[in-house]
Amino acid sequence: MFLEEYDVIVVGAGHAGCEAAAASANLGCSTLLVTMSLQNIAQMSCNPAMGGIAKGQIVREIDALGGYSGIVSDNTAIQFKMLNKSKGPAMWSPRVQSDRMRFAEEWRLMLEGTPNLDFYQEMVSGMVIENNKVLGIKTSLGLTIRGKSVVLTNGTFLNGLIHIGDKQFGGGRAGESAAYGITEDLVKAGFESGRMKTGTPPRVDGRSLDYSKMNVEAGDINPSKFSYSDVTKPLVHQRDCHMTYTSLLVHDILREGFERSPMFNGRIKSLGPRYCPSIEDKINRFADKDRHQLFVEPEGWNTCEVYVNGFSTSLPEDIQFKALRSVVGFEKVKFFRAGYAIEYDYFPPTQLKHTLETKLISGLYFAGQINGTTGYEEAASQGLMAGINAALKVKEKEPLILKRDEAYIGVLIDDLITKGTEEPYRMFTSRAEFRTLLRQDNADFRLTPMSNTLGLASDARLRRMEHKLNESEKMVAFFKETSITPTEANPVLIAKKTAEVNQTDKIFKILSRPQIDLSDVLKFENVANYVANNNVDQEILEQAEIQVKYSGYIDKERANAEKLTRLEDLKIPEKFDYHQIKSMSIEAKQKLSKIRPVTISQASRISGVSPSDISVLLVFLGR
């Protein structure tokens, strides 16, 4: 029925579980993916979209590391947008609207085509743990399946409790059972657990909406894609989304249900995602606002089901329906299903190492919402890293730990491990101090070489990345070496209302001006000839432009990152006794003793540990 013992067992087949299973199997480990329903692999439980601000960077990093999310997202996209294009490239974030059903189907097809990967459908009810080491899992039918390592990616299923108005019932997602037993086993083993909350909006019948009353939200005219590989192509055709607004009337109707709202009557005590509040939370917290945006998002190419982005709610169904019917364009709306809130168990992530292995139990890894994060992309990236590190541990190889200056994934995991979280954590560009280095356009430069060394990213991917890097560097060198005369440069400079040049100048210097962009220098004959003669594509041109315009910022961040690296190299002994340092604050001693940072750099990022505490620690360690 099963192998006698698997190298890696992955529990849960959401975004984290799928990436974990794929990574482990692709690294040559015998892998078992266990889920409560094989029909629900890689479900988009909430919005039908991938990417977005900072999240798009994460999807590109997953792809650069050899994960599947970028390819699946490209192959099932119905619309593409590059967000924040009006800002600098450090802020550009790709996002796709997805075909929900095709997304899950594509994930399953890719997993079924992955060697070394087995599947099993059943609820996992507990862990097999001996002498602080995981040995496998127990199922609800009483089976024991042995594994050298286990990755838990349970999403919202651990003791999940769904709320709609004054109704509540167990469930991990609408129409699916919650998972029981795992939390209890882990708490018994010494883990600390907590509760979090998230929510989702109603789904409605698009045939009942009047789109003529809404604003059209179209995709990019020249769409890009997530994957750096050549196995996917940018969209040729796209579906529009739409935008409408709530109103004071809608807000008044929603307030009618507050006394029956689990958020306001005390039934829900857990904290929800700060940056994705429910509609009732928005009108309560921002009572001065007359309206809130609602994005009307199709769920696929061939379905009339629509996701009402911005209307997450746990209010009673009748209030949800009445309020939506008062929204412009929704006057005749028909419901497919009501919105709801869900509470679930999580485990404070300060109990993990940077590999996502638990400190308490050897061979046990956590990834996704079990660690207190929210979002498909955050979950998928953790799953990928947990799957990689579980496989590397089995093979007795060094783990893969991404630093804060190497990837948003590194920032995410470091934040979780060193700071913890008491509310659902989502990634933002503002969380990354080296975001100019961590752009969406260069994730392949940053991560594909190390992934290729591991055996995840193929040689073909590496060659493609090296070609892009070499050609963009040649283009930058051309800009630095090639001069332009005032006769040719000034007409362009005048048109852009920037100072003329009085003598021959380098194209690099001209392009460095904020008023000048790539389309301007392409008007210069020598640039146009270089591009034509060398078949320079748009991706390489954009990469070269970024390197020119932001070279100063990039150099400054690299210098700061090198300083951080020096602190990362200063190790703290594993069992160091912080209580012996009398001049360190009590709070710092407590936090450091609990989190057990591996390096001085990690210690400095822990909340409650001051610079003076770090100075004392450095002196004590003789550094």
Swiss-Prot record:
Keyword set includes tRNA processing: yes
GO biological process, one term: tRNA methylation
Coiled-coil ranges from the UniProt annotation: none
GO molecular function, one term: flavin adenine dinucleotide binding
Cofactor: FAD
The keyword Cytoplasm belongs to this UniProt entry's keyword annotation: yes
Keyword list, A-Z: Cytoplasm, FAD, Flavoprotein, NAD, tRNA processing
Entries under InterPro entries matching the protein: FAD/NAD-bd_sf, GIDA_C_N, MnmG, MnmG-rel, MnmG-rel_CS, MnmG_C, MnmG_C_subdom, MnmG_C_subdom_sf
Cited PROSITE patterns: GIDA_1, GIDA_2
Protein residues bound to NAD(+): 272-286
Recorded GO CC terms: cytosol
Gene3D superfamilies the UniProt entry points to: FAD/NAD(P)-binding domain (3.50.50.60), GidA associated domain, C-terminal subdomain (1.10.150.570), tRNA uridine 5-carboxymethylaminomethyl modification enzyme MnmG/GidA (1.10.10.1800)
Xref: Pfam families: GIDA, GIDA_C_1st, SAM_GIDA_C
Localisation: Cytoplasm
Residues binding FAD: 12-17
Subunit (UniProt): Homodimer. Heterotetramer of two MnmE and two MnmG subunits.
Task performed by this protein: NAD-binding protein involved in the addition of a carboxymethylaminomethyl (cmnm) group at the wobble position (U34) of certain tRNAs, forming tRNA-cmnm(5)s(2)U34.
HAMAP family: MnmG_GidA
Family: Belongs to the MnmG family.
Protein name from the UniProt record: tRNA uridine 5-carboxymethylaminomethyl modification enzyme MnmG
Organism: Flavobacterium psychrophilum (strain ATCC 49511 / DSM 21280 / CIP 103535 / JIP02/86)
Gene: mnmG
